[in-house]
């Protein structure tokens, strides 16, 4: 019985790792609203503290300067929901705790203790500047690396098309914080 469960779990995890490459949508500069499905892994290694890691799945919808991000465990159990609008940001946990702030970056810092660039993420996901970033293109003209305010974003593509959207992002700051995103599906939202 135990062997069967282990085998079933292994097969399920391997099946979850197989995914189709992200779709090629219209040119990234024209994309305003989008949604994506994928996985994340976050590692925080602060001086004088043991490194902390977490990971799971995410579902992100960006529409008209508002975002809704659902985070779940690798097995699909809800962990948190983050909603941001230009006026208010709200974070709800699976335990029912709720926090609000007028600034999403401040909200995440209050809840996690880490200043994460939440407001810049929609632009960074598409390989655009969230402000005054330096963007270095790959050999076929797509964003390959972005540098902004101490953050570095490295982009990887599964599709060779020049208009392809990234399938992997590695977002890091000073070796202290590393967020890896594996985007399994991009959709343009009308």
From Swiss-Prot:
Pfam families named in the record: LolB
Biological-process GO terms, alphabetical: lipoprotein localization to outer membrane; protein transport
Protein's cellular compartments: Cell outer membrane
Xref: PROSITE patterns: PROKAR_LIPOPROTEIN
UniProt cross-references to Gene3D superfamilies, sorted A to Z: Lipoprotein localisation LolA/LolB/LppX (2.50.20.10)
Highest taxon above the source species: Bacteria
Family: Belongs to the LolB family.
Protein name (record): Outer-membrane lipoprotein LolB
Species, as recorded: Dechloromonas aromatica (strain RCB)
